Curated annotation (Swiss-Prot):
The keyword ATP-binding applies. SUPFAM superfamilies: alpha/beta-Hydrolases. GO terms for cellular component: membrane. The gene is bchO. Pathway: Porphyrin-containing compound metabolism; bacteriochlorophyll biosynthesis (light-independent). The keyword ATP-binding applies. GO terms for biological process: acylglycerol catabolic process; light-independent bacteriochlorophyll biosynthetic process; photosynthesis. This is Magnesium-chelatase 30 kDa subunit. Coiled coil: none annotated. Its EC number is 6.6.1.1. One of its GO terms (molecular function) is monoacylglycerol lipase activity. It comes from Rhodobacter capsulatus.
Length: 284
């Protein structure tokens, strides 16, 4: 999406800017005290930095908060079509941090962003991670083979994203899909997602991420992440069941697990975006 096409009420539009690093033209929210400790926030598949709109105010009072749209999502664009997988995306995010001359005090990731946060903790000096309904599980059974194959096939077809945008992106349909996650977000939140999914480039980025996603090496490496990790799991999450975080916590040497009421988009429903809970853990 061209930033000039963003709705006037797009969250933190005025605090975001382009950052070109290698093949990626990032769109990055950068807010809070410039000399404060840095928090890097990573959204999930199909979302954008807007999804942290309720969390950012609570965090940015004390921290410099950096929120990029992931490659191919929102307003971030990449010409490297083979770098949408977990490890390449983590590598490119670290290059963005180096470009900004920051080392995050913690990385906070939602869903697939939680997996990327853990990959960063494994590969870089990132000292702490918060995962919100972190997507740390494979598709089960036959779906584990069929779904990635479908995504690879669809991502290779030039007409797939426009078709999804044209026939599957009505406000009503998107609202229904969001409700199926176990979270009912407000009308403004649904409108933001509608704007994204009505953009073929955003849909294409999501398909490429699905096609190139491989969790196996990270799952096997969880015992090597000897850093504090705070996993927040929504008991009503229908996209990534709470047991996924519970299972991962057993393999992380310094994990804290907290199960709370709510669905997959719990940080978009909670009045403070879960910032209070996260600050308590970061500063406790």
């Amino acid at each position: 999406m061209d930033p000039r096409a963003l709705p006037a009420n797009w969250p933190y539009r005025s605090a975001a800017a382009r950052r070109r690093v290698g093949p990626i033209d990032w769109w990055v929210i950068d807010t809070g005290p410039a000399d404060g400790p840095v928090l890097l926030l990573l959204h999930g598949l199909g979302a954008s930095g807007h999804s942290f709109r309720k969390m950012i105010p609570g965090l940015s009072a004390r921290y410099r908060v950096i929120v990029p749209d992931l490659p191919g999502h929102g307003c971030s664009r990449s010409t490297a079509r083979n770098r949408f997988g977990l490890k390449p995306m983590a590598e490119d995010l670290w290059k963005l941090c180096q470009h900004l001359n920051v080392t995050p005090a913690a990385v906070i990731g939602h869903s697939a962003g939680g997996a990327i946060a853990l990959q960063l903790a494994l590969d870089t000096p990132v000292p702490r991670v918060v995962g919100i309904n972190a997507a740390l599980d494979h598709f089960e059974g036959v779906a584990g083979v069929v779904f990635p194959m479908m995504a690879r096939g669809l991502a290779a077809l030039p007409f797939t994203a426009p078709l999804v945008t044209r026939f599957g992106a009505s406000r009503q349909r998107i609202g229904q899909l969001l409700d199926m996650t176990g979270s009912v977000i407000d009308a403004a939140g649904k409108a933001y997602y509608t704007a994204l999914i009505q953009t073929p480039e955003h849909v294409d980025g999501g398909l490429r991420m699905m096609a190139q996603w491989e969790l196996g090496p990270l799952i096997g490496a969880l015992p090597r992440i000897a850093k504090p990790v705070f996993l927040i799991a929504g008991n009503g999450d229908r996209a990534v069941p709470a047991h996924v975080s519970a299972d991962a916590a057993r393999f992380l040497p310094m994990a804290t697990l907290r199960r709370i009421d709510g669905g997959h988009l719990i940080h978009e429903v909670a009045a403070d975006g879960l910032s209070g809970m996260i600050l308590d853990w970061l500063e406790g």
